[in-house]
């Protein structure tokens, strides 16, 4: 039996972090957590590119562009969608999650989903560095592990867009 496991060594890795400006009071904390975690694990600050987009809905498009640039070993997506009084929340959450998943499945590099989808501002604050940890930092750690696993397979996928 062969067991594959990733590690968290970020040395020499180039990372893109696509971040939504909407709800920036939360996303900026997620971004800080992600950057800090990457740097702690050996990613050089100059090898981290932050790409700001207007809102969560725009994340998949720019993520796809970042992947196709072939400049990165992996991409993190960060955003915050907080339920309001209308159904807008449901549409945005569904489309951003499907879009990021589709980009990831059609990519040769890991693309991780760090978009918070919460019922309240309080839940978002908790996940941006208070009671529930920092989901940006957790996503960054997951990305490093996935980059390591990806490198273990050296598979060129056919038909990647």
Swiss-Prot record:
Keyword flag Transferase: yes
GO MF, any single term: 6,7-dimethyl-8-ribityllumazine synthase activity
Cellular component terms per the entry's GO annotation: cytosol; riboflavin synthase complex
Transmembrane helix listed as a keyword: no
Annotated (2S)-2-hydroxy-3-oxobutyl phosphate binding lies at 85-86, 127
Q: Which keywords belong to this entry? A: Riboflavin biosynthesis, Transferase
- The UniProt record gives the binding positions of 5-amino-6-(D-ribitylamino)uracil as 22, 56-58, 80-82, 113
Identify which residues the record assigns to the active site.
88
Record-given protein name: 6,7-dimethyl-8-ribityllumazine synthase
Species of origin: Oceanobacillus iheyensis (strain DSM 14371 / CIP 107618 / JCM 11309 / KCTC 3954 / HTE831)
